[in-house]
Amino acid sequence: MIVIVTGMPGSGKSRIVEEFEKRGFPSVSLGDIVREETVKRGLELTKENVAKVSIRLRQELGQNAVAKLAVGKVRVLLEKSPLVVIDGVRSLDEVGTFRGAFPEEKIIIVAVHTPPRLRFERLKARGRHDDPQTWEDFEERDWKELRFGIGGVIAMADHMLINDGSKEEYEKKVKTLVEKIIRGLNRGGA
């Protein structure tokens, strides 16, 4: 089984990935693949360079470039684990790449929705080097994500978590969903 986790930046995707990892299931981050490719190309890991490499990869290999690069890693992990989580899928082309590469695997899409203002505040507080510090930067980043096609992936989700309350409420939702998916794995569904 493959679980694809998607959502806008700052929505709470990584918390879902962490919950699966805590239970022994491995993950592949498409963002990490772009960062690795940036380093391979001899570039410094800056927001601008990572964005340029992401665009260049898609120009060189197609809109599903990052997914194509991830397929080998996912395949290796599926040999050792009945469930692999893929974090950061941003387009239906990427979903299609995984469906095509793994026709024998059940693929579940989990999307997280968090209101924009709340995501902006969380990203500012998180303070990662590539997190926006102004509302204008935040909106620009959101529009880039939407142009990549993330809205289509969110719309096709099998499960949608709404993250608009307290941290404790979201934790409970995440654990409940992860348990449901794992139970489905053991029964052949979800």
Curated annotation (Swiss-Prot):
The lineage's top-level taxon is Archaea
Disulfide links within the chain = none
Report residues binding ATP: 7-14
Question: Which Pfam families does this one have?
Answer: AAA_17 (PF13207)
UniProt keywords (A-Z) are:
ATP-binding, Nucleotide-binding
The molecular function terms of the Gene Ontology recorded here are: ATP binding
Membrane as UniProt keyword = no
InterPro entries reported for this sequence: NTP_hydrolase-rel (IPR022970), P-loop_NTPase (IPR027417)
Q: Which family does it belong to?
A: Belongs to the UPF0200 family.
PANTHER family cross-referenced by the UniProt entry: DEPHOSPHO-COA KINASE (PTHR41930:SF1), UPF0200 PROTEIN MJ1399 (PTHR41930)
- Protein name, please? UPF0200 protein TGAM_0868
Q: What species was this sequence derived from?
A: Thermococcus gammatolerans (strain DSM 15229 / JCM 11827 / EJ3)
Lineage summary:
Archaea, Methanobacteriati, Methanobacteriota, Thermococci, Thermococcales
